[in-house]
A protein has these predicted regions:
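Asp-box/BNR beta-propeller blade signature and adjacent active/binding-site loops
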Residues: 3-453
Length: 453
């Protein structure tokens, strides 16, 4: 064990399949932390509890059978609960090959704490497909929502291309808004005609003759389908991550036509501002960023005002200065300085602030602030390797926060380092959850704040 992980590192999620992780490392996988493969960490503190969220994958790819999983720590990261699955996608197949995409999937969790104390987890959801890795099968010409009773409601399509609308009670209406006799639980995808199960709207194919009812994980495609594209699903916990709500689709509240088939979550954490506004970071396929916000603890969501996109390049995270200004840090197209945007109105609008002197490759980074100090975890090489936590301080120009002066860095690891997530554990410590292998090996470390600054 001492050879496989360094002092201070704790294995939080560990793959058990040698096809996706070095065989020696799979020996650290057990019932408390294991699965076939893992990627994309999110870490947050809720009360005195740390919650680590992750994509629990079937094959290590960005598609296939991907569940959402968490572990919890009530002692500052010293010990962790057994792995808990909080969202299960519908699937026709749960095979382990990366050639298999016979399943819907979740991907890219992002958590934050609402003013009322609830944990909010926003995540991408895709019907059965390969997501952005096979754009040709995404439904570019099918509208995913239609205006019905002054509200954007989800749509379904039959094999002839006719559209249907789902009303608030789950009834499926024809394109003429007449009741079809069908009902659907939209987020889970289960479609019924009366009491007869018709299949799942998020899956391909049609009903086989030997299956008559839905099963927990494997089922079949329904005659009506949701458009193949990215959706935004929100989960909520009111007890520090012990239990979670069913996923709720919020895409229709914030989507605009220009977004195309992808308006996705920038993984990591969101931000609850000093004024109580909850902001979540999104981005579109053109590598521009979007922020959405809620002023009622995540019940309803709004898109940022002004220009529909901020030029902040790809996946991004944000921090708030004591003055209230919010700085967003993006992912560069290649190794170099980090793109930066600033909002002076609590995340309603954003200004392109050029680049900050934080050098990193094309990779997600995590950033949090404590007072005037900013902490950012990222690879410190031209490739995804050599993780560090870089520390800086907000600075002002003409009386306004204008950027961050970076002045020190602390090594996290040597070798592979990709996606990560920072959180404040208590008054004296911060923690980091990070990918220490290309797939399936997610570690946690704790640092004293005074040693970093």
């Amino acid at each position: 064990l001492e050879v496989l992980i360094m002092s201070g590192e704790k294995v939080i999620f560990c793959g058990n399949n040698p096809d996706f992780l070095d065989k020696k490392l799979t020996t650290l996988s057990d019932a408390s932390n294991g699965g076939n493969a893992f990627r994309i960490p999110s870490l947050i503190r809720s009360g005195n509890t740390l919650i680590a969220a992750i994509d629990r994958q079937s094959c290590g790819a960005d598609w296939g059978y991907i569940e959402l999983a968490i572990r919890r720590s009530e002692d500052g990261g010293e010990t962790w609960s057994d792995i808990q699955i909080i969202a299960i996608p519908p699937a026709r197949k749960t095979m382990l090959s990366d050639e298999c995409y016979g399943s819907a999937f979740y991907i890219d969790p992002c958590m934050t704490i609402a003013p009322n104390g609830d944990v909010l987890l926003l995540v991408d959801f895709y019907p059965e497909c390969k997501g952005l890795h096979k754009r040709s099968i995404l439904d570019k010409k099918k509208a995913p929502y239609a205006l019905y009773n002054k509200e954007m409601r989800p749509t379904l399509y039959d094999r002839d291309g006719k559209f249907y609308v789902i009303d608030k009670s789950g009834h499926v209406l024809s394109h003429r808004y007449t009741d079809t006799g069908m009902t659907v639980d939209y987020e889970s995808g289960e479609l019924y005609s009366g009491e007869a199960y018709l299949g799942n709207i998020h899956l391909n194919g049609k009903s086989p003759s030997n299956i008559n009812e839905a099963e927990a994980k494997t089922t079949f495609g329904a005659p009506l389908k949701a458009p193949k594209r990215n959706y935004l699903y929100l989960l909520r916990s009111s007890d520090n991550g012990k239990t979670w709500s069913k996923p709720k689709d919020i895409t229709g509240q914030v989507l605009i036509k220009q977004d195309g088939t992808f308006l996705g979550v920038a993984p990591g954490v969101g931000l609850t501002t000093h004024k109580g506004r909850v902001i979540m970071p999104l981005y579109v396929d053109r590598k521009q960023t979007v922020s959405i916000y809620s002023i009622d603890d995540g019940e309803n969501w709004h898109r940022m005002a002004g220009h529909p996109y901020a030029e902040n390049v790809d996946e991004w995270q944000m921090v708030q200065a004591p003055s209230g200004a919010i700085i967003g840090l993006g992912r560069a197209k290649r190794y170099g300085k980090t793109p930066m945007s600033i909002s002076y109105d609590d995340g309603k609008t954003w200004i392109n602030a050029g680049k900050t002197d934080l050098y990193a490759p094309k990779c997600q980074k995590s950033v949090i602030s404590i007072g005037d100090y900013v902490f950012c975890s990222h690879p410190n090489d031209k490739t995804r390797s050599n993780g560090v936590i870089t520390v800086g301080k907000f600075y002002k120009a003409k009386g306004k926060v204008a950027g961050i002066n970076w002045y020190s860095e602390t090594e996290v690891n040597k070798g592979f380092f990709a996606y990560s997530c920072l959180t404040r554990i208590d008054d004296e410590h911060i923690g980091i959850l990070y990918e220490s292998e290309p797939s399936s090996f997610i570690l946690f470390k704790k640092y004293k704040i005074k040693d970093l600054i």
